[in-house]
């Protein structure tokens, strides 16, 4: 089980990483991304997996770990030294450190040790390099303990350390050979011995082998401790010859081996497992002793393998049954795993492999007390850290991959017990596989040192353990836990002293596999602040969100991801670097090697106080495509000035290469601005421009420059600056003198400090309510080279020139505005197409000090449109979403009153039930809260909209005659037999700009007399597509049009009497629903039911057909003239003059006599009957 670092992804593409292309777009501060120094190596070797900056007497270097050097045959790994300096172009040199990295007295396996996976510099000189997959062999077993080497400043291995142990899988093996005469050929036995012994690791601390030969007698060919290597044993075995004999004393040979060969005098080791291999070709002559001899072997725990050679029996054609049973009885249980038989001596070699494997299987169980691995698979050196006098070595594979931290100090080595770091009780032998020691670090606090180790698989969410060393014992102080399963919280640890007081300020914990919202491995870094001996959570850092697009089907995707997994793995590397931006605080660099589809990127965070700023100061992407340039940001180191300019430089590695980025110095530029005069007094003109008096102002701007790294030296900076007048306004109220421009741009060389002067003048604008802001922007003339501007200081400064205020002797103007509002309508507004406007009258008064920039702001509902303004003086109104009217110039004095009207027009696209208007009066002067109650007015007026339409009605017949001699048909075959048809037409046509509502048209007509006889019979109706009329039951209710016949009896006709009018007739109504349309039509067909009128007594009467229109929308109304239409159809009977009743004749005669009498009386009164001529003649 080999833990993998999160970014150690399988590399399948061979490439050379030319990091000179790492010039991608970045948010830039003072790390120079365009002039970096690059180092390249095979991506298959994982060149760049680790990087360290290094200096010795020979010069300055970048050390680069390449843990897969030697692949594909082996993965030995190594470290390269790469010379640095702007003038250095020498290639990187492989140090061949694995050659001299060795542990004596063990059988080493270096082929896949991945040397260079861990690389840290020693503060006292030299460096430490580790190969966590270094292994040694115990018998047939390989133990991956890991190894670390101290390397001197001159790149020589000083010593190596690995937690190797004496092989606890030692075996003492005695081979008991039948050397009787029947064994033939003896060379086959020798070949068997050679093949078997070659498979064994023979030595004093490993497996020992002795050989006993028997026939009639027993001989010790050599003892267990005779030879100390496999080679020596092989030479001796090849010299053994067959001693012969006429008897096969198997019991004697086994018993002699038990009693003598397994004694300490002959080299047997106390506590080591005893193994006996018996090889014979025939039944024993002392088989009566075998049972007891085998029992004695059992009592002494001697494991026995027995081999029966059947050659003698096969050659003599003898039965082998009894022989096989005897040899089986010799073998240990289970017999099937300890007994072998071969057809003859030549076949012995065929069982060597199986026999060897079964013997080797005993190695794993040689230590019967070992229930699990301890340090055998520890992978010590998976991580490493120097902490004062201690060296911390992470051993993730220790104790069944629960892990531990090996502490090494001079000649003292502390390997904590397997339960030392268990923070919670666990079941016996429970395999936690927490990977403790995945990363290690330390924190310095006043008077003490805290040691920190990460175990990213603990409880699946990860954990960080903080502990102290007290007299060689581990004392756990605190644990920090991750929040997300599988995030690998604790796989990366970094401590940093931000303020350079020699004490740790922060602990940063990486969780590079932290999943984002879209299940992508975005990564997260947790920041903890040191509080005495405890760490307290402060904040989390996250990368730019990566969009994972497996295809371009998603509209948000512009580029398809070609590599998996997707994300950033932000926090794969977290490095504390010395003060990059020369602000007195150390900084942090974090790697995100999966960003940009595995191209990678790093983020730089600047220190501040005792913490770091949450927002990154610079992001450096690799600029690669994720194929030829992979995982930039896998490793980071930044502790040294490698080019002699006094600034810390940063080395960043990935798979296939590394790059050294130079830091650029930081220029501090401070600017001050002064104005003369310092206020704009529009009533005091001090200059003349183009013949007009105005106000002119002189602006003095002073630049002060210095370098952060060399504050005492003189610095000359080439600057470019731009001055913008009235920068808060879209239209400027001022221009530079001699121009009509609001902006000027100039270059300036500043040596320590320099002042310049620019003058400008005010325009004749009516807008003086706020200050004139003057903005000065500046930058270095060549921002790509040399120092950069300090990002802690602004590169833009602002100066404000206020307007002088008319407040007497007061420093502040305190106004008191009032607002009165009235409207033409208050209760209900009926809006018509020809009359869709209304007025709002405003009165603004100031009862306090002068109010500067007095204005009214009018907000109104969407059903209103600003149309215009009337009667306002001096100023005007602007309308965007609201209406702002400036009142007074430039201020509204005490007692001033301004009256004006705002005209609104109704918006036909928004028909609301109310017109809502909010009006307020305000100014730039102060106004007490208690006087603001009369500065606002709210208006809400109900609104109805009168729909403009034309409602027409007409009929095909207005007069129908019934002949006196007409008869009633006895059988009605069609509607033509009933009477004349009357077609009634209704047309509704839209007019005006208001929308047409849904309408309801009710068409009513006399349908039956009071006695139930038909009057007007509806045969059907038609309409335009937007109209739906009901009920259908009124349409031809008798089914005449469908061919149904009906008869009228004479008795029914005789019942009809006189019809004077139709006031008592029963009315039928057709209701039509009209959807909005420019034109709607409804046509109704009616038949005058003549049988009702033929025998009736009447001379003439009128039938009235009414059409009534109604709006279905409460906001849209109809005018009274457009609601009803009536059509009169006159019915008369020809040939029968109407008889006048007697009472009518008598009443008319009386009325005529009365009128005559009144006329005579009136004439008499006026003297009409007097003769004035007669009187004159009498006189």
Swiss-Prot record:
UniProt KW Cell wall biogenesis/degradation keyword: no
Coiled-coil residues are none
Q: Where does Ca(2+) 2 bind?
A: 579, 581, 583, 587
| GO molecular function (one) | signaling receptor binding
Q: Which GO terms describe its biological process?
A: cell adhesion; cellular extravasation; integrin-mediated signaling pathway; negative regulation of cell population proliferation; negative regulation of epidermal growth factor receptor signaling pathway; neuron projection morphogenesis; neutrophil chemotaxis; positive regulation of MAPK cascade
* Residues in compartment: Extracellular: 29-1141
Q: Which residues lie on this side of the membrane: Cytoplasmic?
A: 1165-1179
The protein's topology relative to the membrane is: Single-pass type I membrane protein
Instruction: State which residues carry a glycan (glycosylated).
Output: 100, 105, 112, 217, 317, 341, 402, 418, 459, 531, 698, 747, 779, 839, 882, 907, 938, 965, 973, 1007, 1083, 1102, 1113
Q: Matching PANTHER family, A to Z? A: INTEGRIN ALPHA (PTHR23220), INTEGRIN ALPHA-1 (PTHR23220:SF22)
What is the name of this protein? Integrin alpha-1
């Amino acid at each position: 089980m080999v833990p993998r670092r999160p970014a150690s992804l399988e590399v399948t593409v061979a490439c050379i990483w030319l990091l000179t292309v790492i010039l991608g777009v970045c948010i830039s501060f003072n790390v120079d991304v365009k002039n970096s120094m690059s180092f390249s190596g095979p991506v298959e070797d994982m060149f760049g997996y680790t990087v360290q900056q290094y200096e010795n007497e020979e010069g300055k270097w970048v050390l680069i770990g390449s843990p897969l050097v030697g692949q594909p045959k082996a993965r030995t790994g190594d470290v390269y030294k790469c010379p640095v300096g702007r003038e250095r172009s020498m290639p990187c040199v492989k140090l061949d450190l694995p050659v001299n990295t060795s542990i004596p007295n063990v059988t080493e396996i270096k082929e896949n040790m991945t040397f260079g996976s861990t690389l840290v510099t020693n503060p006292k000189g030299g460096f430490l390099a580790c190969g966590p997959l270094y292994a040694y062999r115990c018998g047939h077993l390989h133990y991956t303990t890991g190894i670390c080497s101290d390397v001197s400043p001159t790149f020589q291995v000083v010593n190596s350390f690995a937690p190797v142990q004496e092989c606890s899988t030692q075996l003492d093996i005695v081979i008991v050979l039948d050397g009787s005469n029947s064994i033939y050929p003896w060379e086959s036995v020798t070949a068997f011995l050679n093949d078997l012994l070659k498979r064994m690791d023979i030595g004093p601390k490993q497996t020992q082998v002795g050989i006993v030969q028997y026939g009639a007698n027993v001989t010790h060919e050599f003892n267990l401790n005779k030879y100390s290597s496999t080679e020596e044993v092989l030479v001796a075995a090849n010299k053994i010859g067959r001693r012969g004999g006429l008897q096969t004393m198997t019991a004697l040979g086994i018993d002699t081996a038990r009693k003598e060969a397994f004694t300490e005098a002959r080299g047997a080791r106390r506590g080591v497992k005893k193994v006996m291999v018996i090889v014979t070709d025939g039944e024993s002559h002392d088989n009566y002793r075998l049972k007891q001899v085998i029992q004695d072997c059992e009592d002494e725990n001697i494991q026995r393998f027995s081999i029966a050679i059947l050659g003698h029996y096969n050659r003599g054609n003898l039965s082998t049954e009894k022989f096989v049973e005897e040899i089986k009885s010799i073998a240990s249980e289970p017999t099937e795993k300890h007994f072998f038989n071969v057809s003859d001596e030549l076949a012995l070699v065929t069982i060597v492999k199986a026999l060897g494997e079964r013997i080797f299987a005993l190695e794993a169980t040689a230590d019967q007390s070992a229930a699990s691995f301890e340090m055998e698979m520890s992978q010590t050196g998976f991580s490493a850290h120097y902490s004062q006098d201690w060296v911390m070595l992470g051993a993730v594979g220790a104790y069944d991959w629960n892990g531990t931290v090996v502490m090494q100090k001079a000649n003292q080595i502390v390997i904590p017990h397997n339960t030392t770091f268990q923070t919670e009780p666990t079941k016996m032998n429970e395999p936690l596989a927490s990977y403790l020691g995945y990363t290690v670090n330390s924190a310095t606090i006043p008077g003490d040192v805290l040691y920190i180790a990460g175990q990213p698989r603990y409880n699946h969410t990860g954990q960080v353990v903080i502990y102290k060393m007290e007299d060689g014992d581990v004392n756990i102080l605190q644990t920090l836990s991750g929040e997300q399963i599988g995030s690998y919280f604790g796989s990366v640890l970094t401590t940093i002293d931000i303020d350079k007081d020699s004490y740790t300020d922060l602990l940063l914990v990486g969780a590079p596999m932290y999943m984002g919202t879209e299940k992508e491995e975005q990564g997260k870094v947790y920041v903890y602040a040191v509080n005495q001996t405890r760490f307290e959570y402060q904040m989390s850092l996250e990368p730019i969100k990566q969009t994972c697009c497996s295809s371009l089907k998603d509209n948000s995707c512009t580029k398809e991801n070609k590599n998996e997994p997707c994300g950033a793995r932000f926090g794969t590397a977290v490095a504390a670097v010395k003060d990059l931006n020369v602000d007195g605080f150390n900084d942090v660099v974090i790697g995100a090697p999966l960003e940009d589809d595995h191209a990678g990127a790093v983020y730089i965070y600047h220190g501040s106080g005792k913490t770091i700023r949450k927002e990154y100061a610079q992001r450096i992407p690799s600029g690669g495509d994720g194929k030829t340039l992979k995982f930039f940001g896998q490793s980071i180191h930044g502790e040294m000035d490698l080019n002699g300019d006094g600034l810390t430089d940063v080395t960043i590695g990935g798979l296939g290469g590394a790059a050294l980025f130079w830091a650029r110095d930081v220029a501090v530029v401070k600017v001050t601005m002064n104005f003369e005069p310092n206020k704009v007094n529009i009533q005091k003109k001090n200059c003349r421009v183009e013949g007009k008096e105005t106000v002119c102002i002189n602006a003095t701007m002073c630049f002060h420059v210095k370098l952060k790294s060399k504050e005492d030296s003189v610095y000359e900076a080439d600057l470019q600056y731009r001055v913008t007048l009235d920068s808060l306004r879209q239209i400027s109220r001022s221009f530079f003198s001699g121009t009509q421009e609001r902006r000027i741009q100039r270059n300036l060389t500043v040596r320590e400090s320099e002042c310049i002067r620019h003058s400008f003048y005010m325009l004749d604008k009516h807008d003086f309510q706020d200050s004139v802001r003057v903005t000065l922007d500046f930058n270095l003339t060549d921002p790509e080279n040399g120092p950069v501007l300090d990002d802690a200081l602004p590169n833009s400064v602002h100066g404000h020139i206020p307007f002088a205020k008319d407040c007497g002797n007061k420093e502040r103007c305190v106004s008191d505005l009032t607002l009165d509002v009235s409207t033409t309508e208050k209760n209900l507004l009926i809006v018509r197409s020809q009359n869709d406007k209304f007025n709002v009258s405003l009165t603004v008064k100031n009862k306090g000090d002068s109010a500067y920039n007095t204005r009214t702001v009018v907000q109104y509902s969407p059903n209103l449109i600003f149309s215009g303004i009337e009667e306002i003086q001096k100023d005007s109104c602007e309308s965007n979403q609201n209406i702002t009217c400036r009142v007074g110039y430039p201020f509204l004095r005490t007692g001033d009153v301004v009256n004006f009207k705002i005209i609104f027009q109704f918006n036909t696209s928004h028909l609301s039930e109310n017109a809502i208007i909010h009006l307020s009066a305000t100014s730039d002067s102060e106004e007490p809260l208690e006087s603001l109650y009369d500065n606002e007015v709210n208006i809400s007026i109900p609104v109805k909209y009168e729909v403009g339409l034309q409602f027409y009605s007409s009929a095909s017949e207005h007069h129908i005659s019934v002949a006196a001699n007409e008869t009633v048909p006895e059988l009605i075959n069609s509607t033509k037999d009933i009477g004349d048809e009357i077609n009634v037409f209704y047309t509704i046509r839209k007019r005006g700009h208001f929308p047409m509502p849904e309408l309801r048209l009710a068409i009513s007509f006399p349908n039956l007399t009071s006695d139930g006889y038909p009057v007007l019979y509806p045969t059907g109706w038609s309409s335009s597509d937007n109209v739906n009329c009901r009920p259908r039951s009124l349409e031809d209710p008798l089914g005449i049009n469908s061919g149904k016949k009906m008869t009228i009896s004479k008795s029914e006709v005789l019942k009809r009497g006189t019809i004077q009018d139709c006031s008592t007739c029963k009315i039928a109504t057709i209701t039509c629903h009209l959807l909005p349309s420019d034109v709607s039509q409804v046509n109704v067909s009616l038949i005058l039911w003549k049988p009702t009128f033929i025998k009736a007594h009447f001379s003439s009467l009128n039938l009235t057909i009414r059409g009534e229109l109604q709006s279905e929308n409460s906001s849209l109304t109809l005018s009274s003239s457009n609601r009803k239409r009536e059509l009169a159809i006159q019915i008369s009977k020809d040939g029968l003059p109407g008889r006048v009743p007697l009472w009518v004749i008598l009443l008319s005669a009386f009325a005529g006599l009365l009128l005559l009498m009144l006329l005579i009386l009136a004439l008499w009164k006026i003297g009409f009957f007097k003769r004035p001529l007669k009187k004159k003649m009498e006189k």
